[in-house]
Amino acid sequence: MGQKINPTGFRLAVTKNWTSRWYANNTDFAKMLKEDVDVRIYLKKKLKNASVSKVVIERPAKNARITIYSSRPGVVIGKKGEDIEVLRRELQKRMGVPVHVNIEEIRKPEVDAQLIADSITQQLEKRIMFRRAMKRAMQNAMRLGAQGIKIMSSGRLNGAEIARREWYREGRVPLHTLKADIDYATSEAETTYGIIGVKVWVYKGDTLGRGAEAQAAATSAEPAAEEKKTRRAPSKTAARKPAAGTDKPLVAAKPAVKRVRKVETPAADTQKSGE
């Protein structure tokens, strides 16, 4: 089932966290959830050229805090912060509460699954061959530190009459290992032949998860245990220290002497009996 389930939902509360972080009662839950969906759709259209990876929405005490993760924060902020102020006012009008907008920069966009998927779909819309776009994205991700990547495209590839799906994988992508940090994303390319879907899985290594502190303590205790094992008992030939409170000088230990047992051989008879 690791091949079928959504990797992000499979790891929620284990190694992944929710992108909407708030609590609501039964009457307000549906309204607030719809607001989150509308805000994400609006930001996706508004910041289409800003390389936005994800949007985290928090609602502390009748306020809203929206964090936008982008590899091009300058496009989001605009000249002298004008664009982000317009964006904040529009979001405040849509949500009906005071909104604070934060921008987080993504240092390695080549390893981010959402940005990889969006890049491939943009190339497909420009009529670039899907195999070339997929292989180029895989090479860039592996070059910049990804331990594994898998990309799948499905639809009328190259304008074929019969829809099909093709996928390529490089490195390891352990989908059923819960401690594996799998970044998963999807995107759609609107071509003249129809919609082509792109799915991306990026394996970034193993994470410690909730028991991070316990495992970190265990790993730090291992070198100390190895040091104890490698320590040897002091040699018997070491110098002996005088007792505390005495003025006696340090007495060097006597070298160990091997005792040899001397066996006396009986004297040989010089005369034979009867002579």
From Swiss-Prot:
Binds the lower part of the 30S subunit head. Binds mRNA in the 70S ribosome, positioning it for translation. Belongs to the universal ribosomal protein uS3 family. It comes from the Bacteria. Coiled coil: none annotated. SUPFAM superfamilies: Prokaryotic type KH domain (KH-domain type II), Ribosomal protein S3 C-terminal domain. One of its GO terms (biological process) is translation. Residues 216-275 are annotated as: Disordered. The keyword DNA repair does not apply. Keywords: Ribonucleoprotein, Ribosomal protein, RNA-binding, rRNA-binding. HAMAP family: Ribosomal_uS3_B. This is Small ribosomal subunit protein uS3. InterPro entries: KH_dom, KH_dom-like_a/b, KH_dom_type_2, KH_sf_prok-type, Ribosomal_S3_C_sf, Ribosomal_uS3_bac-typ, Ribosomal_uS3_C, Ribosomal_uS3_CS. GO terms for cellular component: cytosolic small ribosomal subunit. GO terms for molecular function: mRNA binding; rRNA binding; structural constituent of ribosome.
